[in-house]
Amino acid sequence: MEAAYRKEADCMIVPMPREVDHHVAGNMSREIDLLAESWHVHRIVFDFAGTDFMDSSGIGILIGRKKTMDMHAGKVTAVNLGERVYKIFEK
């Protein structure tokens, strides 16, 4: 998945997969952490444009990266939330 990630200035763009569940969460978290550190980013943008399903593992990815970014005065943003994914954040 790493090839899909990209850096723009001090921002890391993370295109989220179609399904975000426990099968992808662990690897994604590790990859994002490693790249964010090596790229010295201060913002991570999670792009949900292509995501149809997300369970609590996906929430864990975002919360874990937010904690990391908070320690470095950075930010985490979620964009292009479809209706199904948005409902998870509403609750």
Language-model segments: residues:
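Short, charge-rich amphipathic segments
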Residues: M1-E2, H40
